[in-house]
Amino acid sequence: MQKEQNVRLVLASASPRRRELLSQIGLEFTVMPSTKEENAKTTEAGALVQELSRQKAVDIWEQLSGGQGQNPDADQEQIAEETQEPNLNGKRQPELLVIGADTVVCCEGKILGKPHSREAAAEMLTALQGRSHEVYTGVTLYSQSETVTFFECTQVEFYPMTEVEISEYIDSKEPMDKAGAYGIQGLGARFVKGIRGDYNNVVGLPVGRLYQELKSRGWM
């Protein structure tokens, strides 16, 4: 049985894989991708994905809320209640909650984002083949009443790949819009030797952890 949502969810991402994962666990949401330029000072993977996910969530929340920034010194619970306008039935509208997410691959300390060229994709896959790497996804849940930011890390091991296999995989175009230049849920699965941690985290969103965070705060 599907649990009732107590918030209006907005996904600040254009990723079709994240949309599929949210739908898979029965959440109702709308999509409004953030186009904010990514800008983070840290190069540590866990901190990086958390910061970028927060930037995306804040960007969309401010657009939808009319640019009213969150006041960290205010009584956020009171603000949330006061800003929920009643609908025609006299009931309070659900609180707006924006989900921001960002994923990177980290191989031997080097962060790999999405490849911007065929050459970059080949370089990434060459670095990943035959060894283990980590996939980090940061998630931010941003509302007027509370901000929650966390990340999950999953270890993935690849089989050795030949230059021909790498070239043919890039020909499929699958690597070009994915962190680390591969999709574990697609053709890239043929190169995966093992995984330790949350599979969905590698796809782009640790929905198990996400659901627990929503539930523990009364948003579900």
What are these regions (language model features)?
Residues 30-38:
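A short beta-strand-loop structural module common to alpha/beta enzyme folds
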Residues 4-27:
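N-terminal beta1-alpha1 ligand-phosphate binding loop
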Residues 18, 38-40:
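Flexible, glycine-rich phosphate/dinucleotide-binding loops
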Residues 3-10, 31, 46-220:
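Anionic-ligand binding patches
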Residues 40-42, 46:
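N-terminal beta-loop-helix "entrance" segment that forms/cooperates
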